[in-house]
Curated annotation (Swiss-Prot):
Gene transcribed to yield this protein: rpoC
Residues annotated to bind Zn(2+) 1: 70, 72, 85, 88
SUPFAM superfamilies noted in UniProt: beta and beta-prime subunits of DNA dependent RNA-polymerase
Protein name in UniProt: DNA-directed RNA polymerase subunit beta'
Binding site for Mg(2+): 460, 462, 464
Cofactor: Mg(2+); Zn(2+)
A GO CC term attached to the entry: DNA-directed RNA polymerase complex
Highest rank taxon of the organism: Bacteria
NCBIfam families: rpoC_TIGR
Taxonomic source organism: Hydrogenovibrio crunogenus (strain DSM 25203 / XCL-2)
Protein family per UniProt: Belongs to the RNA polymerase beta' chain family.
GO MF entries: DNA binding; DNA-directed RNA polymerase activity; magnesium ion binding; zinc ion binding
Positions annotated to bind Zn(2+) 2: 814, 887, 894, 897
UniProt cofactor note: Binds 1 Mg(2+) ion per subunit. Binds 2 Zn(2+) ions per subunit.
Length: 1408
């Protein structure tokens, strides 16, 4: 048995651990680390440069300076290893022990550890239930603490000031004991009985009902519990012994010129030792109390600054007024241990150089300069030369390489064959920023890069540099080839579209040869194959753009993989016919038989990838690139200033605008419009003018008139170079062409507001001085923005990666039935993202049935392009799919809930790090987003005041949740608040959807057909009507003093306006005017179908449009409430908006939502607030207080559902989660984030955002504890609570209840289970303090922790390794358990030994 345990012990090498635990160090522990006490502040002798004995660099304590050599030189050489020199006391061993041997300082008095004192919340303060101020008063010798009151009336632990202490001494003499400093605090901490205290707090928690008290108690209880569980003792937060860092980690290096550079820590240690020695001497001399006290305070301060300089009081500075770097500073921040050395290391076998274009390379190649290759592959070359017998020793080989003999180059050729290298361009924003290529040796000093991978690297050739890395081991080479090769990364992980797409001159060349020209040379000829066309072109019988007829015979493969042979004659052009040569077999000619713009090329490549697979796609992409370069060279497109056409009607358009502006200025001068209206109108006019000029310019640019073969004049698409460049997608856009040939338009000031005088000139005409000055205004802001944006975007990416890093695909199926519903994404009434795009690559959670009820797709199927098209054609408009949000896997996520791996086009593999992929996909386009906050003004405000809904597509009308009544004029009036109208196409799919506001007039009936341009409904955009649903006679109530009459001078009509409460007298302040309906007999009329009397309360400022005793019918308007223009808030756009969403920030003025479902009423108002009361069906009432200045969107007697918005504003995500649940929250965040990215034309798949939201929802708040060990009100990990509940429900006990909590990404990262990961992210001090106090264990499950401890990450190829290790250790434990439980020991013993040996071998193999 002993042998066996010994054997197992041997296996437990220090590098083979599964968890890392951090706890408080006891004084004994610190002494056990130490190799001796540091007694003197001296470092080295200034003459001999040898370390001083007992000093900070003492060789006796820390080990020898030179390998195997003692300090005095008595023992030298390896043979004396382990001897301790009797003269100088140094052990003869390797000098590297100076990196690991620690020393210690025995402190003359106890000192508090600043981290546990000042890192909020103060742990010492929580433990003692005292405030930080009180503790600091004791620690820094400003107050006494009663340690033992004896028989005096003083309280134990009472604080006494100096005077009070002296008074007490006079009164009671020596009957009591009071102390100051850390000793007093230490005594107090020692006196705490943790178990008894915990029990007392638990009882107190049950007894109290006050929320604040409960919170306070739970905080303390948590701390005490963590002390009990971790085995830490509270008094260890006070130090008696200070450990001293090994000297090599705080080096002292001689500079030339006889000076020394030293680590700041040495200075800090010196101060501590000096003060400690002085204090010891003072204590020996029995110095007066006040001197000793002062020295103790100074010692406390010097230990504080050594541990964390600047945390308390002024930071200690060195000679050059620079703050000294303390121990805490060593580990935190970008330059700290975590981020500088553990997460980012420098590597050997790497180099960097400028990149230049390599148009003749193939996609998997890169050009590597010979010089670089020779340097990078040196060790390989040496070994090859030796193997060949060309060199006898490494030294000889080295010489050969230095001389540059011809044999060396031959060997180099052999070495690099099939040996991939990695190319990386900083900043590496997503995983495509590092890719593997096969090197091709080239002359020169620049790396040649294949043009098609530029978009993945975001590289251009204006002086960019790239780094080269050599994968050394066989495994590394294998991974580089199979996973990182550029030919294996054709699709973007963000959206699944091809990322290897031609751009710029390649696109231009392809576009050029696929254009057609009317009446070009040889038009109408017929050819039997592309070779004939080539010969005709060579013979100059036809032109590249000539329209011809071509006989084709091709094999076409469709989505389902079915081959069909197509024959026939097609109309095409010479250029397109030539492209037939490179078209892969299986694709139809119709993919290339059109103008090849960038979009069309992308479509062709996508089709090729889906139908023929990656290999064909790579070849096709390369061939397209060669053709594009060839033809853009032959075309020689360039442009001159005459190509930028200025439209003839530009001048009259601008004149008209000037007249309109003058007219508005005149109205303003007469006081007819306000300053704001004038500004908005002017900006509107100029925006509109700019559009008109652009439109007219584009019409001139886009078409040119030519004569066809019959001699008629016809229009054809223009061959203007500028237009061709923009139309093909090679370079430039309409916006840029507008500035060249139209007008520059309105400019913005740096604060985002628009300057109302536009630049009417364009760049071809040239700008005058004023216009030039205005344009520099905006341009400078643009440059400043870009710099800020890069930093902000990088920080967002960092936070996203940190929160999502440990989401890895860990199992095939979590077995959940939960799902989310996917529907087309509608914005502004139009479908911006179709259903088929949203569900592609998802797994369906329920059978999908067509309109006729037959099942199209079965539950659990992964949707590919074919199935998605099937669903689309069958007219299904919503599909339930699995999502990362609903996945129930405890650690990580399952394949089924994630679906397709976008970068590979098939089901995601086990071990795929989908979290990091999600974070990179969201973060990478961050730099393309805008930074500005939009002030609504000008064009934006014009679009907000909508007053009707127009149909855009023809189709069938469908009402959704609409309540309507007919009024006396037979118009249909809408009386619902959340009603919508959809337009369905012939298959019943939703094409458009519109919200129809309360009080609109409907022009259509449910189910009728409409065509585009039909108006569905109209309403007044500036007022909100109150509409009667019953008919009867008007009777006013509470009008006296609360309502004033206005008589219109022109018409003589009277209207009643409700006064605001500020304008009323105190007697009428509380009155609430209302209108009620009575019948002929004076009885009150009820609402139709109810017993409730028809009363309409009138809010402030509403204008009553009926008079006393008027007769009204259902659907008539009683009053109008003017809508304030308070809706023009600033819209946060771009990057800040995305950051706000992911940080789950509460908006400035959040929308207030109904907490329960029921009927709205208003209660008694307070001074600044109105009281909204919702009465539930059960009769219970729920009250909400709303500030007076917020406009309430609902009216008395109206029914609301839980989660409906009652006060307008930006929704608060926490409210959405609480009231509407996880799915609605996910939908909100996904839609909002997508809106920002869509505005910039960036496509990101929803599931990336869902993955991040999943991580934001990791925590729950415990509502009731049940029979678990949780504490009420604490935040716990969702997976852990589920696990505990499973455990107690199996035992038949009560489960804990909880509520999901939404955390922002920064908070979620810091709240992760792994303290190593959290500490390396932000707030290192706080995280480590907390971890140490609670004795946290890091199970090393995430990626980051494993990188930090230098392991393979548990993802990708490391996933299998970790799995094997886990299984092996589980097996060993099982065997050991069985072994302990059996009687027949010897038999099992042999078995276990064999098992263990085989298990360890298998682990070793996996590691290798």
């Amino acid at each position: 048995m002993k042998d066996l345990l010994g054997f197992l012990k041997k296996q437990n090498v220090s590098s083979d651990f599964d968890t890392i635990k951090v706890t408080l160090a006891s004084p004994e522990k610190i002494r056990s680390w130490s190799f001796g006490e540091v007694k003197k502040p001296e470092t080295i002798n200034y003459r001999t440069f040898k370390p001083e004995r007992d000093g900070l660099f003492c060789a006796k304590i820390f080990g020898p300076i030179r390998d195997y050599e003692c300090l005095c030189g008595k023992y030298k050489r390896l043979k004396h290893r382990g001897v301790i020199c009797e003269k100088c006391g140094v052990e003869v061993t390797q000098s590297k022990v100076r990196r690991e041997r620690m020393g210690h300082i025995d402190l003359a008095t106890s000192v508090a550890h600043i981290w546990f004192l000042k890192s909020l919340p103060s742990r010492i303060g929580l433990m003692l239930d005292m405030t930080l101020k009180e503790i600091e008063a004791v620690l820094y010798f400003e107050a006494f603490m009663v340690v033992d009151p004896g028989l005096t009336p003083l309280e134990p632990w009472q604080l006494l000031s100096e005077e009070e202490y002296l008074d007490a001494m006079d009164e009671y003499g020596d009957e009591f004991e009071a102390q100051m400093g850390a000793e007093a605090i230490k005594k107090m901490l020692q006196a705490i009985d943790l178990d008894a205290e915990a029990t007392r707090l638990r009882e107190e928690m049950e007894a109290t009902s006050s929320e604040t008290k409960q919170k306070k108690i739970s905080k303390r209880l948590k701390l005490i519990d963590s002390f009990v569980q971790s085995g830490n003792k509270p008094e260890w937060m006070i130090l008696d012994v200070l450990p001293v860092l090994p000297p090599e980690l705080r080096p002292l290096v001689p500079l030339d010129g006889g000076r020394f550079a030293t680590s700041d820590l040495n200075d800090l240690y010196r101060r501590v030792i000096n003060r400690n020695n002085r204090l010891k001497r003072l204590l020996d001399l029995m110095a007066p109390d006040i001197i000793v006290r002062n020295e103790k305070r100074m010692l406390q301060e010097s230990v504080d600054s050594m541990l964390d300089n600047g945390r308390r009081g002024r930071a200690v500075t060195g000679t050059n007024k620079r703050q000294l770097k303390s121990l805490a500073d060593m580990i935190k921040g970008k330059q700290g241990r975590f981020r500088q050395n553990l997460l980012g290391k420098r590597v050997d076998y790497s180099g960097r150089s400028v990149i230049v274009v390599g148009p003749s390379l193939r996609l998997h190649q890169c050009g590597l300069p010979k010089k670089m290759a020779l340097e990078l592959f040196k060790p390989f070359i040496f070994s090859k030369l030796q193997k060949r017998g060309l060199a006898t020793t490494i030294k000889a080989a080295k010489k050969m390489v230095e001389q540059g003999l011809p044999e060396v180059w031959d060997v180099l050729d052999e070495v690099i064959r099939e040996h991939p290298v990695l190319l990386n361009r900083a900043p590496t924003l997503h995983r495509l920023g590092i890719q593997a290529f096969e090197p091709v040796l080239i002359e020169g000093k620049a790396i040649n890069l294949h043009p098609l991978v530029c978009s993945a690297f975001n590289a251009d050739f204006d002086g960019d540099q790239m780094a080269v890395h050599v994968p050394l081991s066989l495994e590394a080479q294998l991974e580089a080839r199979t996973l990182m090769m550029s030919t294996n990364n054709l699709l973007s992980p963000a959206n699944g579209d091809p990322i290897i797409v031609p751009s710029q001159d390649v696109v231009l060349g392809l576009y050029y040869i696929t254009r057609e020209k009317i009446n070009a040379k040889g038009e109408g000829k017929a050819f039997s194959n592309w070779m004939e066309v080539q010969r005709a072109l060579d013979a100059k019988a036809v032109h590249v753009h000539t329209k011809i007829k071509l006989k084709i015979e091709e094999t076409v493969i469709d989505d389902a993989g079915v081959e069909t042979v197509k024959k026939g004659i097609v109309d095409t052009t010479v250029g397109r016919a030539l492209l037939l040569r490179i078209l892969p077999k299986g694709l139809g000619f119709d993919l290339l038989n059109l103008n090849l713009t960038k979009k069309n090329i992308s479509k062709a490549l996508n089709a090729c990838y889906r139908i023929l697979g990656p290999k064909e796609t790579v070849i096709f992409a390369d061939q397209l690139m060669y053709a594009g370069f060839k033809w853009s060279t032959l075309a020689g497109l360039s442009f001159c200033s005459d190509d930028m056409l200025i439209p003839d009607d530009k001048a009259p358009i601008i004149e008209r605008a000037d007249e309109q502006v003058t007219e508005i200025q005149r109205q303003f001068a007469q006081g007819l419009v306000t300053e704001g209206e004038r500004y908005n109108k002017v900006v509107d006019i100029w925006s509109h003018t700019n559009e008109l000029v652009t439109k007219s310019m584009m019409e001139e640019l886009q078409y040119e008139t030519v004569t066809d073969a019959e001699g008629n004049e016809v229009k054809q698409t223009s061959f203007n170079s500028v237009y061709m460049m923009a139309d093909s997608g090679a370079r430039g856009s309409v916006a840029q062409m507008r500035q060249l040939g139209g007008m520059r338009g309105l400019m913005a000031k740096p604060d985002g507001s628009i300057i109302e005088t536009p630049i009417t000139a364009n760049f071809r005409e040239g700008l005058n001085v004023l216009q030039y000055f205005i344009s520099t205004h905006g341009a400078r802001k643009g440059l400043a923005d870009t710099a800020l944006k890069t930093a902000n975007s990088g920080y967002l990416t960092r936070r996203l990666v940190d929160v999502a890093q440990d989401v890895v695909v860990t199992e095939p199926d979590c077995g959940t039935d939960a799902s989310i519903t996917m529907a087309p994404h509608v914005e502004g009434g139009e479908v911006v993202e179709e259903l088929k795009e949203r569900i592609l690559g998802r797994v369906v959670a329920e059978d999908v049935a067509g309109l006729d009820g037959e099942i199209i797709v079965e539950k659990g199927t992964l949707l590919d392009e074919r199935l998605v098209n099937l669903i689309d054609e069958s007219g299904v408009d919503a599909v339930k799919v699995h999502s990362p949000i609903t996945c129930e896997t405890k650690f990580g996520i399952c394949q089924k809930c994630y679906g397709r791996d976008l970068a590979r086009g098939h089901m995601v593999n086990l071990g795929e790090a989908v979290g990091v992929m999600a974070a990179q996909s969201i973060g990478e386009p961050g730099t393309q987003l805008t930074m500005r906050t939009f002030h609504i003004g000008g064009t934006a405000s014009a679009s907000t005041a909508q007053s009707q809904v127009e149909v855009k597509h023809e189709g069938k009308v469908k009402f959704d949740n609409l309540k309507t009544i007919k009024n006396t004029e037979n118009q249909v009036v809408v009386t619902s608040r959340s009603g919508e109208i959809s337009i369905l196409d012939s298959l019943g799919r939703e094409k458009e959807r519109y919200k129809i506001p309360y009080g609109s007039m409907l022009n259509v009936k449910d189910g009728i057909d409409v065509t585009s341009g039909n108006v569905l409904a109209t309403w007044d955009a500036h007022t909100h009507p109150i509409i009667t649903e019953a008919e009867g006679i008007i009777q006013f109530g509470n009008f006296d003093g609360a309502v004033e009459e206005h008589v219109d001078e022109l018409t003589g009509l009277t209207t009643h306006v409700v006064k605001s409460s500020k304008e009323r007298s105190s007697a009428t302040k509380e009155l609430r005017p209302y209108i009620q309906l009575v019948d002929d007999k004076g009885e009150v009329v009820p609402f139709p179908g109810t017993q409730t009397p028809a009363m309409y309360y009138l809010p402030e400022n509403s204008v009553v449009v009926v008079n006393q005793s008027d007769k009204v019918g259902a659907g008539d308007i009683l009053a109008r409430i003017p809508q304030e223009s308070s809706k023009t808030k600033d819209i946060t756009g771009g990057l800040p908006r995305v950051a706000d969403l992911f940080e789950a920030r509460v908006p400035k003025e959040p929308a207030i939502m109904a907490e329960v479902s029921g009927v709205v009423g208003f209660g008694k108002e307070t001074k600044g607030k109105q009281r909204l009361v919702i009465t539930q069906d059960s009769g219970e009432q729920h009250e909400t207080l709303i500030p007076k200045w917020r406009s309430v969107d609902v009216f008395e007697g109206e029914r609301v559902e839980k989660g409906d918005v009652v006060v307008d504003g930006n929704p608060n995500p926490h409210d959405i989660l609480r009231l509407l649940g996880v799915e609605r929250l996910t939908k909100y965040i996904v839609d909002e984030v997508q809106d920002v990215y869509r505005l910039q034309g960036v496509r990101i798949n929803d599931k990336h955002i869902e993955t991040v939201v999943r991580q934001m929802l990791r925590k729950v708040e415990v509502r009731s504890t049940g029979d678990t060990s949780l504490i009420k009100g604490e935040q716990a990990e969702f997976a852990r609570v589920l696990e505990m509940n499973e455990k107690v429900s199996d035992e038949g006990s009560v489960e804990a209840s909880y509520q999901r909590v939404l955390l922002g990404i920064t908070k979620a990262s810091l709240a992760t289970e792994s303290f190593i990961s959290a500490a390396s992210f932000q707030e290192t001090t706080r995280v480590l303090t907390e971890a140490a106090v609670s004795g946290k264990e890091d199970k090393l499950v995430g990626l980051k922790e494993n990188v930090i401890v230098g392991r393979l990450i548990p993802a990708g190829t490391g996933f299998a390794y970790h799995k094997a290790r886990k299984e092996a250790s589980e097996k060993t434990q099982r065997e050991l358990a069985a072994f302990m439980n059996t009687d027949d020991e010897s038999a099992v013993q042999e078995e276990v030994v064999e098992e263990t040996i085989s298990v360890t071998e298998s682990v070793e193999q996996t590691t290798e």
